[in-house]
Amino acid sequence: MDMLDPGLDPASSATAAAAASHDKGPEAEEGVELQEGGDGPGAEEQTAVAIASVQQAAFGDHNIQYQFRTESNGGQVTYRVVQVTDGQLDGQGDAAGAVSVVSTAAFAGGQQAVTQVGVDGAAQRPGPAAASVPTGPAAPFPLAVIQNPFSNGGSPAAEAVSGEARFAYFPASSVGDTTAVSVQTTDQSLQAGGQFYVMMTPQDVLQTGTQRTIAPRTHPYSPKIDGTRTPRDERRRAQHNEVERRRRDKINNWIVQLSKIIPDCHADNSKTGASKGGILSKACDYIRELRQTNQRMQETFKEAERLQMDNELLRQQIEELKNENALLRAQLQQHNLEMVGESTRQ
């Protein structure tokens, strides 16, 4: 397939058409027509447009591959791919064949709404007459948005450009002889009927750091408004109040018991009623004092246990010495010896 990259005239919204033949057989020949349409006299300037590859299933011959790429991010560019027979190329027939429409716009900011207009038979034939697109009623049908870059089989991958121009593809079976598509930027949500698909390459899906727009809310949010209270709500409210009252009474009773246990607080409470905060503060001080006293008592108890063990060892030593002394006296008596201390006492 021959590649054709025409230069578009920025001063006018003229049509840039390119026709190429691929595997022309004895029965039919397929051509490609490329058109650029602006929104009006004030449409932004468009730059070069190239053809490479689009989904193969959209066209009759699966060996043909197309690619649409915009080198400028601004404005709106509409491409119309028309299958042309031999008779249409020679100007013998006015009826157009299967038509596939691909439109693109820079999805830079706001929400995009897809509208559908009708075209006559002249708009589908290659030539200058295809530049004018009269509007007409048409029924909505499913569409698919293909994010650039995309590839089809062995076609070269498109280069990623800032702005990420996207393509809305309408198959030939859904587009009739008198229909076309234009993309306009509006403030409303997408009004196209049917299902909405977003297809892109894995590199674009796994790419990190890119900001993605969230789908707008299709229905307005209605805040919950409380109506009149039912008897069931009143009964639950009364039960809740009763539970809270019992809980407060229990807390007050425990605080009164604390005031009676604490010595200083009990004396003060007899004179003037102490507050709950004062009672709890004195209770905390009393608990800290009890902990310190308990720690001192534990240390004293350990010391007493150590002294008791020492006394037990001394008592055992005294018993051993007494037994040894008794044995020595028995030996002296056997040898008829008198102890010096005993003779002196006598």
Swiss-Prot record:
Residues 235-290 form the bHLH domain. SMART domains: HLH (SM00353). Residues 11-20 have a biased composition (Low complexity). CDD domains: bHLHzip_USF2. Residues 226-244 have a biased composition (Basic and acidic residues). GO terms for cellular component: nucleus. Keywords: DNA-binding, Nucleus, Transcription, Transcription regulation. Residues 1-44, 215-244 are annotated as: Disordered. GO terms for biological process: cellular response to glucose stimulus; glucose mediated signaling pathway; lactation; lipid homeostasis; positive regulation of DNA-templated transcription; positive regulation of transcription by RNA polymerase II; positive regulation of transcription from RNA polymerase II promoter by glucose; regulation of transcription by RNA polymerase II. Its main location: nucleus. InterPro entries: bHLH_dom (IPR011598), HLH_DNA-bd_sf (IPR036638), USF (IPR051732). GO terms for molecular function: bHLH transcription factor binding; DNA binding; DNA-binding transcription activator activity, RNA polymerase II-specific; DNA-binding transcription factor activity; DNA-binding transcription factor activity, RNA polymerase II-specific; double-stranded DNA binding; identical protein binding; protein heterodimerization activity. Interacts with MAF. Efficient DNA binding requires dimerization with another bHLH protein. Binds DNA as a homodimer or a heterodimer (USF1/USF2). This is Upstream stimulatory factor 2. It comes from Rattus norvegicus (Rat). The gene is Usf2.
